[in-house]
Design a protein with these regions (language model features):
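N-terminal secretory signal peptides and thylakoid transit peptides that target proteins
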Residues: 1-16
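Small-residue-enriched, tightly packed secondary-structure blocks
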Residues: 28-185
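Generic hydrophobic alpha-helical segments
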Residues: 16-17, 180
Length: 185
């Protein structure tokens, strides 16, 4: 097989894999389905440890994406729907989408949560029609084992993010560059 044929095969396979594994607006979840998934994800998040419960209770808002699908082979895509929670109640619904190119392979389903630790960071997020993680507002990713001493007295960043509940295997998963957009449900 020639290099150009091999390259075309890899590109076609990547696009095919991405198209078949990632949800689209045709598969958009209903409001009640999103709310149900959020309740399950919030319980799972709280069960990760007492400091996650503290972070949940002390945050000005939480952007919860209970089911994000990510997949790719060189070209990767991800998509999910969730809600912005204030006082642990959904106030607005959002989608998250990303596309990337580089060393990545596999498929994964996961949940993600972005904790807004101040009213100011929450207001900045809500003011924008769309929001790109890492470009529009800085954030710090939390490893599940790192939430040992994080509380409202030690916040040093406006936004903290965590990925949890992973199923499947996808090398190269990141939230960086993910685009969050308000949706109607």
């Amino acid at each position: 097989m020639k290099n150009s044929s091999r390259r075309q095969f890899i590109i076609a396979s990547s696009v095919g894999l991405a198209c078949t594994t990632i949800g689209t607006t045709a598969n958009a979840a209903s409001r009640s389905r999103i709310d149900s998934r959020i309740k399950i994800a919030m319980r799972e998040l709280a069960n990760l440890g007492p400091n996650f419960s503290k972070l949940i209770n002390s945050s000005a808002g939480i952007l919860m994406m209970p089911k994000v699908r990510s997949g790719g082979l060189m070209f990767g895509t991800s998509y999910g729907e969730g809600a912005l929670l204030i006082g642990q109640a959904p106030v607005e619904y959002y989608s998250v989408a990303a596309a990337s190119f580089g060393m990545q392979v596999g498929w994964q389903k996961y949940s993600s949560a972005m904790f807004f630790t101040s009213e100011n960071s929450l207001a900045r997020f809500r003011r924008n029609d769309g929001w790109t993680l890492g470009a529009d507002l800085g954030y710090t990713m939390i490893d599940q084992g790192e939430v040992i001493d994080i509380d409202s007295n030690t916040y040093s960043d406006d936004v903290y993010g965590v990925i949890f509940g992973q199923e499947g295997l996808h090398f190269g998963v990141t939230l960086e560059g993910s685009k969050y957009s308000r949706i109607t449900r």
